Amino acid sequence: MTSYDDFDLERFVTAQAPVFETVLAELRAGCKRSHWMWFVFPQLRGLGRSSTARFYGISSIEEARAYLAHPLLGPRLDLCTRIVVTSESSSLHAIFGSPDDMKFRSCVTLFSLATDNSDNPFRHALHRWCAGQPDKQTLVLLDDARRSSRNQV
C-alpha cells in the first residue's frame, strides 16, 4: 500500500491551511477571486506550464488515489467539488474564470478515474458542467503513463 508520504501530499495541506476558509466562501458565492486553484483542485502534472502548476501537479493515478485517501485532502476535495456541483452559477467560467475553468475539468476528470465509487462528486461535476465529457488531455496523459508502465514490465 502506498503511503501519503510517498507523494509529499503535505505540500497541499500546507498550501491550503491559510486559505481554506476563503476557498469555501468564494466557492459558495459562486466566484473564485483569489489564487488557490493549483492546490485545491489539482490536475495532472504536464498539463500546466508554470512552476506552481508543476509543483502541485499530480504525478500519477496512484498519487490521485493517495490524495483521495488522505484524511484531510480527500474530504476537502469532495466538499469543494460538491459545492461547485450545486452552484447556482451559470457556468464553470462564471465560477472560476479562464483558464481555471479548464483546470477544474482536468481535476474532476482525474479524480473521477481515481475512485472506485461510481457515485462521486467528480462524475457529477463532469455531467453538470461538461456535458459528461472528460478532459481529453488528461485522458491522453493517463493513457501514455499506463502504456509506459506496461512497457517497463
Which residue stretches match the model-derived regions?
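C-terminal end-helix/capping segment
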Residues: G57-R76, W129, K136-Q137
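Mid-chain, well-packed structural core segment of small domains
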Residues: A66-T115
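Extreme N-terminal tail/first-helix region
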Residues: M1-E21, D143-R147
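Short amphipathic alpha-helical segments and their helix-coil junctions
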Residues: V13-E26, V84-L92
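Hydrophobic/aromatic-rich, well-ordered segments within soluble, folded domains that form packed cores
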Residues: E26-I61
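Charged phosphate-binding loop/patch that engages nucleotide di/tri-phosphates or the phosphate backbone
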Residues: N117-V153
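Short helix-capping/linker segments at secondary-structure and domain boundaries
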Residues: G46-T52, S112-R123
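Residue-level detector of well-ordered alpha-helical segments, enriched
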Residues: K32-F39, R76, D100-C107, P121-F122
